[in-house]
A protein has these predicted regions:
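Long, contiguous binding/interaction regions
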Residues: 1-29, 43-50, 57, 71-72, ...
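Short hydrophobic/aromatic beta-strand micro-patches
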Residues: 39-41
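Conserved short hydrophobic interaction patches
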Residues: 54-58, 62
Length: 123
């Protein structure tokens, strides 16, 4: 997946504050609301808020807009809406519980089972 400049800036900002297990998902084919979802782990509320703050500063410095931020007061799960990119900053237990990566992952092709043949009738 080729990342646009906004997504690359977001990932760089999260890496600078030591965000854990950064996952970037291309969700263009699943929703018309946004193109890219980024999920990042935080070790604490404090780190979660720092990740969110760093992300917002870097995006604004790029000249892009931050459309909204939810959950910063608590810090357990912070959502940062950047328009075409949505970033979820989550503490590990919350991330594991909601498992957004699997929920938004592209569907895997199902393996087909061979059909059982009907047994021949004895003569």
């Amino acid at each position: 997946m080729k990342l646009d400049k906004l997504a690359k800036t977001a990932v760089a900002a999260l890496e600078d504050i030591k965000g854990r297990d950064i996952v970037v998902l291309d969700v263009k084919r699943m929703t018309s609301l946004f193109d890219t979802m980024i999920v990042v782990g935080a070790d604490s509320n404090r780190q979660g808020r720092a990740l969110s703050s760093s992300l917002q500063e870097r995006v604004k410095a790029l000249g892009a807009r931050v459309y909204g931020v939810e959950g910063e007061q608590v810090g357990e799960w912070i959502l940062v809406d950047l328009g075409s990119v949505v970033v979820h900053v989550m503490q590990h237990a919350t991330r594991k519980y909601y498992n957004l990566e699997e929920l938004w992952a592209p569907p895997r092709p199902r393996a087909r089972r061979p059909r059982a043949r009907k047994a021949a009738k004895p003569s």
